[in-house]
Amino acid sequence: MTKRKKEVIDVDCSEKKDFVIDWSSAMDKEDEVPELEIVNTTKPTPPPPPTFFSDDQTDSPKLLTDRDLDEQLERKKAILTLGPGLPDKGEKIRLKIADLEEEKQRRVLEGSKMEVDRSSKVVSSTSSGSDVLPQGNAVSKDTSRGNADSKDTSRQGNADSKEVSRSTFSAVFSKPKTDSQSKKAFGKELEDLGCERRKHKAGRKPVTRLSNGWRLLPDVGKAEHSAKQFDSGLKESKGNKKSKEPYGKKRPMESSTYSLIDDDDDDDDDDDNDTSGHETPREWSWEKSPSQSSRRRKKSEDTVINVDEEEAQPSTVAEQAAELPEGLQEDICYPTRDDPHFVQVCLKDLECLAPREYLTSPVMNFYMRFLQQQISSSNQISADCHFFNTYFYKKLSDAVTYKGNDKDAFFVRFRRWWKGIDLFRKAYIFIPIHEDLHWSLVIVCIPDKKDESGLTILHLDSLGLHSRKSIVENVKRFLKDEWNYLNQDDYSLDLPISEKVWKNLPRRISEAVVQVPQQKNDFDCGPFVLFFIKRFIEEAPQRLKRKDLGMFDKKWFRPDEASALRIKIRNTLIELFRVSDQTE
């Protein structure tokens, strides 16, 4: 090993040794250890993370100022005039308007409440102080203060409302206390705020009275569901009570309002529906109805009724809901399975007869068939009527708007719906309409041979939601197509109506616009259609003439009569299920 390598090894060994410090020699014994000093330092608060709002949050009425709230409300109402042309027919706009009006009303009530609380505190501090004056002194003091304030009107502008509120409440406490005052000390104030009315009508939503004598009913879509456990057989006394809404006042020399429209139709088709064929009525009677959840209509429009035109009418005793027994069979066929036009009803279909539910096609078709069976024995008019089921109008609409090259063959297949029935020999044809989750009714009135007034089409709608013009137009085209088909044969040898009317039938079909009772909610359109049929069959003459149109009126029957039909149909079906279960 060389000397140089040995020196390198010695250096490396010395570097690897621990370095030891002699603190006793490095530090003097008299030196003191410095004290630890803790200094509080405030770190700057980090800026909050950016907040991202969704469209719903930015459009929330609570985030708007009063001015912006009023501007949005006016703008939405202006847009609502275009509702029929919108994809959802203005439904979303109506809901937005309802939210804005609710927020505006909340702010008004909240501001009034804050003013009352502030005035109450002023009154409390005044009455508890030692300088409470008698009534005369208080009046003189207020008078003198008023004179002093009148000298400087520039400082009075912002305090006018507060001074009026304070003086009003102070006057209540400055007067001698009497029994009547103790009971109605704040009667006027509570009446202005609407609290007195809510006290007498607990649990009910307030009715807004407008300056023109009309009243604004709350949104029926937000009403509370009062009927529970309906299918379990619980008797709903509240659900069966007749509506307490006042009804129409009879005016002297008042007749029904209607007009006759007799115009020629153009044969231009509106829609292009390419449909291959039509099923028979029997095939359609087994079709599943849409679920009840999809039948909910959202309606946020307020209903306005005229108080001056209504008065209370004695309501009839409502029929009680029967209990639903257990162990019933799943379905029945009415009147029997052997009947060629029987209607099948499942036990589950009874759910639509619960309060606030929308009637389904099986129940509607059942009751129309039930009316035919019940009235035929006592009234001859039922034999001269033809009832199409609830699925017919959709097929009618497809047939009259079909634009294929085989239009004639298409109509021949469509005629299977009334195979073997001469429609023009009937006195009345009933066509139920179901569109946009709403029910309405069309009645075709056919005259006899002595009457040359022509055919009349009636459209009865308890809410006025359906397009009367398009529905009547489709029915007219249907009657014309049937007339063209029958004219190809020797049908004219034995005409059921006047020869003059028959030769010019396309121009002798008119529409009579009539007024009918209107429902007070948005879920009784089905019972109203069935009650229209029931009442019409009971009261209509053998053949309807123009002079008979006076039977139609908004006071034709009470709305609660039609609403009560829901319970009657349910009880009838339960009894039929019982009888069918016993026989089988």
UniProtKB/Swiss-Prot annotation:
<feature type="compositionally biased region" description="Basic and acidic residues">
    <location>
        <begin position="176"/>
        <end position="196"/>
    </location>
</feature>
<feature type="active site">
    <location>
        <position position="438"/>
    </location>
</feature>
<feature type="active site">
    <location>
        <position position="461"/>
    </location>
</feature>
<feature type="compositionally biased region" description="Basic and acidic residues">
    <location>
        <begin position="221"/>
        <end position="253"/>
    </location>
</feature>
<keyword id="KW-0788">Thiol protease</keyword>
<keyword id="KW-0833">Ubl conjugation pathway</keyword>
<keyword id="KW-0539">Nucleus</keyword>
<feature type="compositionally biased region" description="Basic and acidic residues">
    <location>
        <begin position="99"/>
        <end position="120"/>
    </location>
</feature>
<feature type="compositionally biased region" description="Basic residues">
    <location>
        <begin position="197"/>
        <end position="207"/>
    </location>
</feature>
<dbReference type="GO" id="GO:0006508">
    <property type="term" value="P:proteolysis"/>
</dbReference>
<protein>
    <recommendedName>
        <fullName>Ubiquitin-like-specific protease 1D</fullName>
        <ecNumber>3.4.22.-</ecNumber>
    </recommendedName>
</protein>
<dbReference type="GO" id="GO:0010228">
    <property type="term" value="P:vegetative to reproductive phase transition of meristem"/>
</dbReference>
<feature type="compositionally biased region" description="Acidic residues">
    <location>
        <begin position="261"/>
        <end position="274"/>
    </location>
</feature>
<dbReference type="InterPro" id="IPR038765">
    <property type="entry name" value="Papain-like_cys_pep_sf"/>
</dbReference>
<keyword id="KW-0645">Protease</keyword>
<comment type="similarity">
    <text>Belongs to the peptidase C48 family.</text>
</comment>
<dbReference type="GO" id="GO:0016929">
    <property type="term" value="F:deSUMOylase activity"/>
</dbReference>
<dbReference type="Pfam" id="PF02902">
    <property type="entry name" value="Peptidase_C48"/>
</dbReference>
<keyword id="KW-0378">Hydrolase</keyword>
<feature type="region of interest" description="Disordered">
    <location>
        <begin position="28"/>
        <end position="64"/>
    </location>
</feature>
<dbReference type="GO" id="GO:0016607">
    <property type="term" value="C:nuclear speck"/>
</dbReference>
<feature type="compositionally biased region" description="Basic and acidic residues">
    <location>
        <begin position="142"/>
        <end position="165"/>
    </location>
</feature>
<feature type="compositionally biased region" description="Basic and acidic residues">
    <location>
        <begin position="275"/>
        <end position="286"/>
    </location>
</feature>
<feature type="compositionally biased region" description="Low complexity">
    <location>
        <begin position="121"/>
        <end position="132"/>
    </location>
</feature>
<dbReference type="GO" id="GO:0009651">
    <property type="term" value="P:response to salt stress"/>
</dbReference>
<dbReference type="GO" id="GO:0070139">
    <property type="term" value="F:SUMO-specific endopeptidase activity"/>
</dbReference>
<dbReference type="GO" id="GO:0016926">
    <property type="term" value="P:protein desumoylation"/>
</dbReference>
<comment type="function">
    <text>Protease that catalyzes two essential functions in the SUMO pathway: processing of full-length SUMOs to their mature forms and deconjugation of SUMO from targeted proteins. Cleaves precursors of SUM1 and SUM2, but not of SUM3 or SUM5. Able to release SUM1 and SUM2 from conjugates, but unable to cleave SUM3. Protease activity mainly directed at deconjugating SUM1 and SUM2 from their target proteins. Regulates salt stress responses and flowering time. Redundant with ULP1C.</text>
</comment>
<feature type="active site">
    <location>
        <position position="525"/>
    </location>
</feature>
<feature type="region of interest" description="Disordered">
    <location>
        <begin position="99"/>
        <end position="323"/>
    </location>
</feature>
<dbReference type="GO" id="GO:0005634">
    <property type="term" value="C:nucleus"/>
</dbReference>
<dbReference type="InterPro" id="IPR003653">
    <property type="entry name" value="Peptidase_C48_C"/>
</dbReference>
